[in-house]
Amino acid sequence: SPDRYPQREMSIQWNESDPAFLMRLWRKHGIAWGVRAEADASPTAPPRHTLVLFDSASQFPANPAGRLRCHTGTSVQGRDDITLWSPVGQLTPGLVERSAWDYKRQQAQWADAPTAARQGDEGDALSRALLDARIEPPHWADSGADHHQLTLARMQHHEMNTASVAGASSARDLACLTWASIDERAGLPGRLPGVGSGLADVAGNDFLFTQVSHWG
């Protein structure tokens, strides 16, 4: 919408490729992207892929594989599941501050955004000591509301990096930009720090697949 993404007065592309230029603009406004494989129209049709831009993952479909279960892969199972589960936590700042001079309104713009991520007792204490602060170029944002939205987008980027999971699965129909529920860990180690206390325990949560690679 025009309120969420105001029209840019000027865009400068310098010493960067077209994809790098577009990704820089998307990243600034909190727009994520991914590539989705489309169903083949016929067995002889060439593969088709769609570039997907999004600012919310709430509308993505469920994964074709359905609910997944973790196990060690040491025994024969009746279905394809997750055999490797590796949660990754990253310490991120507790506050983002952005300021800029708005020459159109002849006033300074300033906004801050605190984190909603929970990184454990020690992690939260360290996070409160970390600040992502920057003075942006003049007229960085279209308005005060846009300035706050851009600041919030930067904090949401940090929150996304707080917790992720790398893994392996024997399921052959996992698809990027879909989500699935993870049922049991069945002895697999790993607790996932994340946004809100509900993600402290890995079991029974929904996860979005952002990257899928195939081997073999």
Predicted regions and their residues:
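Amphipathic alpha-helical and helix-coil boundary elements used as assembly
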Residues: 1-216
